[in-house]
A protein has these predicted regions:
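Active-site microenvironments that recognize anionic phosphate/pyrophosphate groups
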Residues: 1-161, 167-238, 242, 255-256, ...
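Charged catalytic carboxylate motif
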Residues: 130, 246, 250
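Internal helical hairpin/lid segments
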Residues: 249-266
Length: 353
């Protein structure tokens, strides 16, 4: 443990079959680079926000006066359901193929000032139930359904209203997980959860059904994996009522810890990975998969200093300064049952500015 805390080394990510350079000694360097405005919770949200209940969107469509979740087709989709076939390639270096799909927007709550950390467990449970319904609907037609949330302007979110996106298209590669299953006869992430529970070095949160860890191979400073403990669910549609309720609870607690770390509305990209879907899919057909969520937050030292994936990261391999163990310890030390907006004073709850 002392070695990985004090000396540079590389770590292997078996999910992506790639390596991450960890350079803990760089945590001591002074920062004189770009800073961001601290992401704050909205105390006075825009009354004309196009995602709020009853608002009119850019295309003239009016939202209903929804009181819980609300799903609608993305007004500016990246994927369309009807597209022509591309021309045949004239050289093997210039190959393209048809891409079909659909994009939806899902609002979590009618109030633009809300975030997951501020919502009630029952309100978050309604979000999870809608995710399951959307996966069941789109998964019957598409091989991959990607549910993801970009939170905060620093992550490219153009609207601060609590919402996510759902893109249905082709599925992501899963060869590494399949190869591990063929070699060991067990799902890679099932084994990984067992090992993290034994080592107890990177656990942030745990309840009766789920565990949150900073993965051993984390690329982003406070990246986390949200994993089920039992039952080996392959997709969100496999979750039991108890798993869904416990998921709502741990999501609220994790997001509260994130916000409390630097006393800000913590930005991130998050999303769900599960077994591919499609008309040919059926229960239990992808035993190498374990459904899980990934949180990828950019903040590094404070609410104003972010991690940039540039230069070496783009041209060679991912590099990080803070070790995953240090990040897990910092998050684990933050309160999960009380939000920073109910505290007084500034700075973060660990006394680090």
């Amino acid at each position: 443990f002392l070695y990985v805390t004090n000396h540079q080394h590389v770590r292997y990510n078996p999910l992506k079959d790639e390596w991450i350079l960890v350079s803990p000694h760089r945590c001591k360097r002074p920062w004189s680079g770009q800073t961001e405005p601290p992401p704050e919770h909205q105390s006075d949200p825009d009354p004309d926000n196009p995602l709020k209940a009853g608002a009119t969107r850019a295309n003239g469509q009016r939202n209903p006066n929804y009181t819980s979740t609300y799903v609608f087709p993305n007004d500016f989709p990246a994927l369309l359901e009807t597209v022509p076939e591309p021309p045949s390639p004239d050289h093997p270096l210039f190959v393209s193929t048809q891409a079909k799909g659909t994009c939806r927007v899902m609002c979590f709550h009618p109030d633009s000032a809300m975030t997951i950390s501020l919502m009630s467990v029952q309100e978050i449970l309604a979000v999870i139930e809608e995710w399951v319904a959307q996966l069941r609907d789109l998964g019957g037609r598409y091989r991959w359904v990607q549910i993801f949330e970009n939170k905060g302007a620093v992550m490219g979110c153009s609207n601060p209203h609590p919402h996510c996106q759902i893109w249905a298209s082709s599925f992501l590669p899963n060869e590494s997980q399949k190869q591990y299953f063929e070699k060991y006869g067990r799902a890679m992430l099932v084994d990984y959860v067992e090992q993290e529970l034994i080592k107890k070095e990177r656990i942030v949160l745990q309840n009766s059904e789920w565990v949150v860890v900073v993965p051993y191979w984390a690329a982003w400073p406070y990246e986390t994996l949200l994993l089920p403990l039992d039952g080996h669910p392959q997709r969100l549609t496999d979750l039991t009522p108890n798993q869904k309720l416990a998921l709502a609870e741990i999501m609220k607690h994790l997001n509260t810890k994130y916000d409390n770390l630097f006393r800000c509305s913590f930005p991130y990209s998050m999303g769900w990975h599960g077994a591919p879907t499609g008309a040919a899919s059926k229960d239990g057909d992808s035993p190498h998969w374990l459904v899980h969520a990934v949180y990828l937050p950019p903040l590094l030292r404070s609410a104003t200093v972010r991690k940039f994936m540039v230069g070496y990261e783009l041209l060679a391999q991912t590099q990080r300064d803070l070790t995953p163990e240090q990040a897990a310890s910092a998050l684990a030390s933050c309160p999960h049952d009380r939000h920073y907006t109910s505290f007084h004073g500034k700075g973060n709850l660990l006394g680090v500015n």
